Design a protein with these regions (language model features):
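A conserved hydrophobic secondary-structure block that centers on an alpha-helix together
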Residues: 214-217, 221
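Conserved catalytic cores of very large enzyme subunits
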Residues: 2-189, 221, 225-765
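Extended amphipathic alpha-helical scaffold segments
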Residues: 203-211, 273-277
């Protein structure tokens, strides 16, 4: 890492995060002027107004220009989506348990007196709440399932970066002008053209700023850098990039512009090493210093950490630690099925090893063709302990997409949005994080409904759980589709849609079914606790008959505080096998019930003509979802978290080592989980030391690939180090750990999430 990159990192985190009202005020100012116009035009004009008037800056020593806010890591508001939680939490932002922000008293006054009164009763949230039935509201209030993305843009998408970079904005504007001439009544084309032209003007604002700064700059080398930024910006406003610097700059400008449009999480980066390779090679051919090109890439990686998302307190519990979702996958397959690893794949990992920040959320695609040098580079990066890169298995993911009707060529081109959500870059609008389903809560409901049922059998209980899962999936689909329609009718994204295949041919926004692939992704959470509970209940009640069902239910209701409660809990934990130890009897329960969940989910369609797709990952939702579930037959206390990750074993229950964990997860039908899965594994640093340690990790990754698991990620850290960081956070400000599908600064996490990471089993190889 160069001195410049070190200083850029330090400057990014030097000050307290603040909330900026600028986007909200500009958006609102435009919206007041467009009453009566089509929603998509109002949205486009508001975004264009932001691009024209928002304050811009180029910070000291930056090589890549473009900042969403002048102050680093500031949160922005989108009251047009949901003004109510913002009003409720204005005074809580600086002191809340997770993801704190400072906000001035004057900004609070402006929000209360100017912004909120305008958006009250005219936001997307008002529409969604008005459409939700009482039954759906009841289910969400008890957290049987949650409906997400009701308060901001959907995001969770990858634009067609090759189209942007290989054609350039000038050519794209010309194409959109033709569409407008052919169909002048089509508001989507008009809105997209307006925003493409506004994007050009916004980029030219940076060119002018760089020239102004250069004119007064007394540092010769910095003056030349500013003039180069100006030249690149003027070129990018009209022409396709020719060099790596130009490509990185246009790539970042578009990321910032799309943030203004929707204020969404997980506008992810796709297969960065594939579409950026021609520009990297062109710069090398032109004689650029490879060390400078690496510094450019490191600059871009640092920039990815400047965008943080302002979430509600409850949402921050589900998505703790600013998982912005700048996710990129490296390696994988070409469209012809050959290995896609290239020199830029290695450089992306090298640059990350220098920077070691939570974003970008890099991942590596493994397959039978992956070569040893790249696998070892991957293992070397994992060993650093930041949880990056995560690993995805082509041998599972490609068939999973084929099973959903995706073409083979497109399936081989898959990438990931957000945390682990599987998507086809530039061709999918997948609503990948639309809902989370609490499987353990459903079991709890069934247990209580059978109180006093002397005729209850284990098979009868299983059948009731299946039926109840099916019932609540129906309600989850209903709520998800209302949210889907809300985004269509209230929050179209015409600029983003112009970079998604088939939207231009159809003349429709992604929210209106314009994309080639239209999924709705919903996560089943708690499968480890569910199978552990049912296996223990079957053994204790129906096989060994040590307690009656009602006696066990009484112990659970009392949270194991009855005279025999602790003894019962110890037996439930220690005498019955647990998922994650390669024991068929309990693993098969997981496989059967998760398959039932998947097959039920995939029955349903969304308003865009696509189908629902199941996944199993938690982000950090295993903590709040566990807080609403009472004591369970796996020995879990009332309110205790669920198993982390999605497919990970419950904390402390994976006693047979990491290979046994792999074998347990391999018994699940990973191909059905086409919205993504998540498996956390924690290693002690000592087990990966030296060349031998790297080889062991590489062999473990090959076993993961051969066993046909879909995903795995790692923490490599001692629990003692984490405990010290809790006690002396000022000494561990740069400590990055893996949460669930993303990495975060350990000291920025709430204590409940910190404790969760500390308690995870640390394995040895």
């Amino acid at each position: 890492m160069t001195n410049r990159i070190s200083r850029l990192k330090t400057a990014l985190f030097a000050n307290t995060r603040q909330i900026s009202l600028e986007r909200a005020l500009l958006y609102t100012a435009s919206h007041r002027q467009t009453e009566g116009e089509p929603v998509i035009m109002r949205r486009a004009k508001a975004t264009a107004y932001i691009l024209e008037h928002v304050e811009i800056s180029i910070r000291d020593e930056e090589l890549i220009a473009g900042n969403r806010t002048v102050k680093p890591r500031a949160g922005i508001m989108s009251p047009e989506m949901d003004p109510y939680w913002l009003l409720k939490e204005l005074d809580q932002f600086p002191t809340r348990p997770q993801d704190r922000f400072a906000i001035s008293e004057e900004d609070k006054r402006i929000y209360r007196e100017e912004l909120f009164p305008y958006w009250e009763k005219r936001s997307m949230k008002d529409f969604i709440n008005g459409q939700m039935t009482d039954e759906v509201k009841a289910a969400t209030s008890t957290q049987i399932f949650s409906i997400n993305q009701t308060d901001k843009g959907q995001g969770h998408i990858i634009i067609d970066y090759p189209r942007l970079l290989n054609h350039g904005l000038g050519e794209l504007v010309a194409q959109m002008q033709q569409h407008c001439q052919q169909q002048p009544e089509n508001h989507f084309y008009q809105a997209a053209l307006l925003l493409l032209e506004a994007s050009q003007k916004h980029i030219l604002r940076y060119a002018e700023l760089a020239e102004t700064m250069a004119a007064s700059c007394t540092d010769g080398p910095r003056r030349e850098e500013l003039l180069t930024i100006a030249e690149i910006s003027r070129h990018n406003a009209e022409h396709k990039p020719q060099t790596f610097w130009q490509a990185c700059q246009l790539f970042w400008y578009m990321n910032i512009i799309l943030q203004y449009e929707s204020n969404a999480s997980s506008l992810s980066l796709g297969r960065f090493d594939q579409y950026m390779l021609p520009f990297y090679q062109a710069s090398l051919t032109q004689g650029e210093d490879p060390a400078f090109l690496k510094e450019l890439l490191e600059s871009l990686w640092v920039k990815c950490n400047d965008i943080v998302l302002l979430r509600s307190t409850s949402s921050a519990r589900y998505f703790a630690g600013f998982p912005t979702g700048y996710t990129a996958l490296l390696g994988g397959l070409t469209e012809n099925g050959r290995s896609a690893v290239n020199v830029l794949s290695f450089l992306c990992l090298d640059a990350y090893q220098s920077v070691q920040l939570p974003q970008p959320n890099l991942g590596v695609r493994t397959n039978a063709l992956i070569d040893t040098p790249f696998l070892m580079k991957t293992a070397e990066t994992i060993r650093l302990g930041t949880g990056i890169p995560q690993i995805f298995n082509d041998e599972v993911v490609v068939p999973a997409f084929l099973n959903r009707g995706v073409s083979l060529e497109d399936a081989r081109d898959y990438s990931v949005v957000g945390c682990v959500e599987l998507s086809i870059p530039g061709r999918t609008y997948g609503l990948h994080d639309i809902a989370m389903f609490n499987l353990l809560k459903v079991m709890e409901i069934c247990l209580h409904e059978n109180e006093g049922n002397a005729a209850l059998t284990y098979e009868g209980l299983l059948e009731q759980i299946r039926a109840k899962i099916s019932h609540y999936i129906t309600l989850m689909v209903e709520g998800s589709n209302i949210c889907d329609i809300g985004h269509r009718d209230w929050a179209p994204v015409p600029l983003l849609s112009s970079f998604i295949s088939d939207c231009l041919e159809k003349g429709r926004d992604i929210t209106d079914g314009g994309a080639r692939y239209n999924f709705s992704g919903v996560q089943g959470i708690g499968i480890a606790n569910l199978s552990d509970s049912l296996h223990a209940l079957k053994g204790m009640i129906f096989d060994q008959q040590r307690l009656s069902f009602d006696e066990l239910l009484s112990v659970l209701k009392a949270n194991f505080t009855t005279p025999e409660g602790e003894k019962v809990r110890a037996r439930l934990i220690n005498r019955f096998e647990k998922y994650g130890n390669d024991i068929d009897e309990v693993d098969n329960i997981s496989a059967e019930l998760l398959r039932h969940y998947c097959k039920e989910v995939e029955k349903y369609q969304n308003p865009r003509g696509g189908y629902f797709t199941p996944g199993s990952y938690t982000v950090s939702a295993h903590v709040p979802l566990g807080s609403v579930v009472g004591a369970t037959p796996d020995g879990r206390f009332a309110g205790e978290q669920l198993a982390d990750g999605g497919l990970s074993p419950m904390l402390g229950q994976d006693a047979q080592g990491p290979t046994a964990v792999l074998k347990s997860v391999s018994k699940l039908d990973n191909t059905l989980l086409s919205n993504g899965t998540l498996l956390n594994v924690k290693f002690t640093p000592a087990t990966l030391e030296g060349e031998a340690g790297l080889r062991k990790l590489a062999d473990f990754l090959r076993a993961f690939t051969q066993l046909k698991l879909q995903h795995i990620q790692f923490n490599v850290v001692n629990a003692d180090t984490l405990r010290e960081a809790q006690q002396r956070p000022q000494d561990y400000a740069g400590l990055v750990v893996r949460v669930a599908g993303y990495s975060a600064f350990f000291v920025e996490l709430s204590k409940e999430i910190q404790d969760d990471i500390i308690r995870r089993t640390a394995h040895q190889l």
